[in-house]
Amino acid sequence: MNPISYWQRLKVAFQYVMPQIYMTQAAGWLAKQKWGAMTHFVIKAFAKKYNIDMSIAEKEKFSDYASFNEFFIRPLKENARPINQNPTALCCPADGRVSECGHIEDDRLLQAKGHFFSLNDLLAEDKDLTETFKNGEFVTTYLSPRDYHRVHMPCDGTLRKMIYVPGDLFSVNPFLAKHVPNLFARNERVICVFDTEFGTMVQILVGATITASIGTVWAGVINPPRHNEVKEWTYEGESAVKLSKGQEMGWFQLGSTVINLFQAGQVQIADHLSVDEPVRMGEILALKK
């Protein structure tokens, strides 16, 4: 790996000393304000800066959004993201870019070139889950500020468990993924465990700096409030939540990362997926073995 510059070192160092929680709380407060013309001006400037395509949004006019949060989790027009109908295929859960993907080497996942992190740490030291996914497959998808920020199901699934894991709020952009050790295993996250025809699948919504909230369609907003301990919910019998392939399952209010885990021998990651590959929700993510 090439050495990083002085300014890049400062950028990394700032992540460790900045008041992550307070910055995120401030961003969340600002994003939910309804300030009329000022809000519309900020939304328009943001869309221009990040070259956001509003033609696929259900509401194309900036003036149709009362707050920045409404804009950020804007729904798309019907059929803007067709769902691959191959019954042996899993589809991408979100728009974004592939941060990393491939084989889980025993208990190790690749975070960035030359940097690994622990499956056990990622799964909040849940021993049963860790054993379930050892030597399995994974895909990490980074959602940039310009991307659509609702998260969908790669396949039909029945929710069995949800785990909220408190943690840091480092930025998760590709540069910092290369320079902050154990980034995804130290950030705040929501772990969702599903039974599927492709075996047990986990979909993890990872928080980040100024990701003011993470929510799911069955539980609503998970955070805030933020907690200092791991919280777990189980869903059995009539309380089990059933979701269909392509159905929305959650969202971020400001960008972050989705990590998918699959059991060993169940799926093969799609051949076209590689690091920094742009993906759209609904495209092929993996195929049943």
Where are these regions (language model features)?
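Contiguous, well-folded functional domains in the mature portion of proteins
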Residues: 1-289
